Amino acid sequence: MKKVLALVVAAAMGLSSAAFAAETATTPAPTATTTKAAPAKTTHHKKQHKAAPAQKAQAAKKHHKNTKAEQKAPEQKAQAAKKHAGKHGHQQPAKPAAQPAA
């Protein structure tokens, strides 16, 4: 296992694996190079997921109206009634017949 590790390290450093293997066989490797430092502790931040809104049709998104709770539609009138809404004053109501004073 140590030889495999030595070969991997040698390949990573760009040295000849044969020369490095011969060198490590004759001299013991220092312990500082083979020990690994403990990795730094990483903190994982969790994202806060919002609840997905209900899906709507595209037209409903574009033409959103601010509707009040159960608003009644006004009564529909004929077109002429809309145009002449304020012109009812020209007709005077019929006066009751004058009664002779006795």
UniProtKB/Swiss-Prot annotation:
Residues 22-41, 91-102 have a biased composition (Low complexity). It is found in: Periplasm. Residues 22-102 are annotated as: Disordered. One of its GO terms (cellular component) is periplasmic space. Residues 80-90 have a biased composition (Basic residues). Residues 1-21 form the signal peptide. InterPro entries: Acid_shock. This is Acid shock protein. It comes from Shigella flexneri. The gene is asr.
